[in-house]
Amino acid sequence: NFDCFEINFHEKSERIINIQILDEIIDRLIFPFKKFDITTLEYKPFTRFTIAQSLDDTTSGKLSSFLNLILRDRDTGCFIIGPKNYSSKTDNNFLIKLATAVTHLIGNPNHDAMAGKYYARFHVKHEDNSDSYLRKAYTNMDLHTDGTYVRETTDWLLMSKIEEKNVEGGETAMLHLDDWEECK
């Protein structure tokens, strides 16, 4: 029972669980999330677990169990989580903290050698001349554990999209491994 979330299947796949955080929970997270700036989160690992605990406390400890259950279930294995309503309270820093809290409810993230942080962050633009396919719009971005920029074993990958504006062709698409044509 999650009174503070709206939970349903994604409109295009029952393998993807949509979790929308209601305003009352967002309001309860503002204070604990403001205690730490992004730089503090980057340099002090315990602060990441502190904001994760704040998020989990809003659900009496049920959110972490639910997220881990989804990830370990082959029939789902995927969720999309975020505020139901976006406002000035849910700015980029808030969303980075929310993504940090979610990842730390699931486990201890690997250190990304390329970014030099516990997370990698980049902008995707309509036109991009970089050599990284990660920054190119309208290309498939396959989440996989081989070729990640870490030295540790990687159990799963999480991707958090902070903002999407003026996209040509619609929203980002997400497919479960079992839905790929080449895997059938």
Language-model features: where?
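Non-heme Fe(II) oxygenase catalytic core, chiefly the N-lobe of the double-stranded beta-helix
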Residues: 1-184
